[in-house]
Amino acid sequence: MYPQGRHPAPHQPGQPGFKFTVAESCDRIKDEFQFLQAQYHSLKVEYDKLANEKTEMQRHYVMYYEMSYGLNIEMHKQTEIAKRLNAILAQIMPFLSQEHQQQVAQAVERAKQVTMTELNAIIGVRGLPNLPLTQQQLQAQHLSHAAHGPPVQLPPHPSGLQPPGIPPVTGSGSGLLALGALGSQAHLPVKDEKNHHDLEHRERESSTNNSVSPSDSLRASEKHRGSSEYSLDPKKRRVEEKDNMSRYDSDGDKSDDLVVDVSNEDPATPRVSPSHSPPENGLDKARALKKDAPNSPASVASSGSTPSSKAKDHPHNDKSSTPGLKSNTPTPRNDAPTPGTSNTPGLRPHPGKPPGMEALTAPALRTPLSIAPPYGTPFMMGHHPEMNGSLTSPGVYPGLHISPQMSAAAAAAYGRTHMPGFDPHPHMRAPVLPASLTSIPGGKPAYSFHVSADGQMQPVPFPPDALIGPGIPRHARQINTLSHGEVVCAVTISNPTRHVYTGGKGCVKIWDISQPGSKSPVSQLDCLNRDNYIRSCKLLPDGRTLIVGGEASTLTIWDLASQTPRIKAELTSSAPACYALAISPDAKVCFSCCSDGNIAVWDLHNQTLVRQFQGHTDGASCIDISHDGTKLWTGGLDNTVRSWDLREGRQLQQHDFTSQIFSLGYCPTGEWLAVGMESSNVEVLHHTKPDKYQLHLHESCVLSLKFAYCGKWFVSTGKDNLLNAWRTPYGASIFQSKESSSVLSCDISADDKYIVTGSGDKKATVYEVIY
């Protein structure tokens, strides 16, 4: 135990000999401890240095990712501009004299011969003083690939005009370099990847009894964290993550009660069948999915037309008024793993792809139509639906926490306005591919399929007028946010368009959207109990009466014509909850979807229950009525959609599915019924023919659905935060918006000029539809 070279003290009588030995040993132990402490300090300094270097590398990674994305967009822009200018020259040249034609042709040919020396000189002139040489070299290399690439045919732009949003040729290069310089200067908060994925994994496990809304809003706030909040201290990060998790578990104000518990699914059952899940951007969904552990629940936030469920193992959440809902059906994933790292579980890079490919195949960067991009790129970018305006959106790069300052500046460099991620799809307004081509290299496979009576699926060849023509919107613009203060499970718009009604926990708020600056409701209608969610609210055609239903056995009828809104009557049923409401066109009858599966029919004049349609074996979740008032359509948690003859009071048809039905809408012009599934699909059925369309742009359950009053298009919203607008019936994607949380409800104004959505972010959003 002691060193051999120690000199023991001589033994003296009357004095114990071990005293000196113990003291010396203590000194040696102290010395060794101090040595180890110094060594530990040295290692800690080295560790901090490595952590700093790692963070710096991650910053560089995000910077180059931004650069590659910007370069790719710029390359496609310049290719398209050059092609159109070339076409204009070709049209003008015949008007010149023969001599001038030859001179112009030679000048055009000379202009096409761009050498590397000229490219380097151009980049050197345009480069900013603080732009690192490596970035200039990268740009030169990238541009040289574009300059010497093979010629590729592009679909012509209608009318040959330059689409809005493409900057002039002279300013494009400087805008691109500004982005590169910005990337080199910006301080990007990039979290430790391992901790980030661990946190997301714990998020999914902790979502058994919580709605997706808290996690969605927290992710959005994480994406907006400034660089000053990023800490290199692992201890501090662990404390922050612990705090974050406590926020998930303790946020009682979010939609804890809006969960459909499907945690009893069979782990051996495939999550998604291949025929229902086309690949995205060349990566098959089934490969990209992270396999959930057997005990990992799949929680589904519900909409105003979606059934409610209390988590059965949370006594404080249990309410006798709302039954727990169970599902034995296979359930798709609810949250895709965060792309961006090659070591993410379940994300395997394809052979030959450069690192970082997975980040570029993120759902937010998908191409909605099966149109080949101008040419396949090393990054498989192609055209992106979020390209126009959504560079400022925090959801563009999932898993990469890019500061909003940099995103906004990058958008400014490209001349885009600060608005949510809508896609006017100018490139889609061209003839599309034949049905035989299901996938194009560098583009997204088809998302709309025709399913024949025998079950054969074929991609849909869209007609030339799929996205153009009278009554077809080009995009939508967010014009107002209504801060309700609770999760908004129900929305409706008055006719004429002036007021918006938002239903949350225990109350409906009325907003006047005719005044743009209005930030507070004009009235509040307290309904049900304070802790019970409103699930549906419907206005009678005269706009003077509002009917409200939710997590209670009573429906409340409000008189809005009086000086202050008052309760005119209450309708009480035997079911503990109402999930959805419909009003007959003559305003005499109200239909309510009950949690026991029955459809209650109410006489509004006499305020009595006149009939019940019985058929659904589980909760009836959604409802719509035909324009002539003769037929009723209902969807349920028993995986069926049923139609009812209102004159004869009997069931007409039943459609069976493999997934719970969360939303549906019947086309005002007749023929078509759109159905939103728990499985993330939207299916468009014909009311008499057996064939149908299946649409695959949502990544999680489809929570609400509404047809435009013209019948030419409809919108759907989902737990994936998306608002999708589709062409009736074949489902060409008209535009898409990504919100910051699950979109639980939606409505369209009677003039088809406005859309309102209700969100898990405790707000409603008003969009103006642009034609």
UniProtKB/Swiss-Prot annotation:
Lineage of producing organism: Eukaryota, Metazoa, Chordata, Craniata, Vertebrata
Gene that encodes it: tle3b
SMART domains: WD40 (SM00320)
Example of a GO biological process term: negative regulation of canonical Wnt signaling pathway
Claim: Phosphoprotein is one of the keywords in the record: yes
Protein name per the record: Transducin-like enhancer protein 3-B
Bias-annotated ranges (Polar residues): 320-332
InterPro entries found in the cross-reference section: Groucho/TLE_N, Groucho_enhance, WD40/YVTN_repeat-like_dom_sf, WD40_repeat_CS, WD40_repeat_dom_sf, WD40_rpt
Record region (GP domain): 142-209
Biased composition (Basic and acidic residues): 196-206, 219-257, 282-293, 310-319
Species per Swiss-Prot/TrEMBL record: Danio rerio (Zebrafish)
Segments for region (Disordered): 137-174, 196-360
Annotated GO CC locations: nucleus; transcription regulator complex
Record PTM Phosphoserine, positions in chain: S296, S299
Chain positions covered by the region annotation Q domain: 1-141
Motif Nuclear localization signal per record, residues: 235-238
